[in-house]
């Protein structure tokens, strides 16, 4: 069920334009994917990434980023994609197991994706995209790669023999797969077949494909067109 302009239970914020390298990777993809997995209707409120945010938006998201979520049923406003995934997961056991250990495992891996893996992926993207060619980035890269490889090796050991992190597919896999996509093509995943196979399982799901297509369809061709 793709995003719809009609009123829906959840409203998610996103951008109506980003540079080409960011298309398909903006973090509103995460709650979109979760909604698609369980057929939960959602609508999008698109912001112009090339313009200053409306001042009122900082009350929803203190840094003016996306996504933020408004749950029309409860009236709750939530920011940070991990918190949003947890909120959506609470609505349906297909995304968050109801048995205590399954729930604890899924939540642990949700936090692990964003606290133990994403910081390295984010920094790697920073030095290779935004600081490419700068001396400090070249000096930082070897130690960053070494540390990232250690994290990925431990992740591969943890995933080996499992289909999904918490037994069943869950919000933990949405979190981890979207983080791993950020370093796909760097060679770091390709050197670890267990992680590549895990990522391919995740992004081959129809719900991911629907969420990705919906996000890409929302982008205007240029900042001027998004104004």
Segments predicted by a language model, with ranges:
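Short secondary-structure boundary/hinge segments and terminal tails
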Residues: 52-55, 201, 219-221
């Amino acid at each position: 069920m793709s995003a719809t302009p009609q009123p829906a239970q959840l409203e998610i914020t996103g951008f109506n334009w980003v540079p080409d390298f960011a298309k398909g990777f903006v973090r509103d993809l995460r709650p979109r994917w979760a909604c698609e997995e369980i057929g939960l209707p959602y609508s999008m409120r698109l912001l112009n990434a090339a313009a200053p945010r409306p001042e009122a938006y900082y009350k929803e998201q203190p840094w003016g980023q996306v996504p933020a979520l408004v749950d029309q049923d409860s009236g709750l406003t939530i920011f940070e994609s991990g918190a949003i995934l947890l909120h959506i997961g609470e609505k349906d056991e297909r995304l968050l197991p109801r048995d205590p250990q399954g729930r604890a495992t899924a939540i642990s891996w949700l936090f692990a994706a964003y606290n133990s893996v994403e910081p390295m992926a984010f920094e790697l993207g920073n030095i290779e995209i935004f600081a490419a060619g700068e001396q400090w980035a070249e000096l930082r890269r070897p130690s960053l790669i070494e540390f990232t490889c250690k994290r990925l090796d431990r992740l591969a050991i943890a995933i080996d023999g499992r289909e999904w992190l918490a037994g069943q597919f869950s919000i933990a896999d949405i979190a981890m797969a979207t983080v791993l996509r950020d370093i796909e093509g760097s060679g770091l995943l390709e050197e670890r077949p267990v992680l590549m196979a895990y990522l391919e399982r995740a992004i081959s799901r129809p719900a991911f494909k629907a969420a990705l297509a919906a996000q890409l369809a929302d982008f205007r061709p240029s900042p001027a067109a998004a104004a």
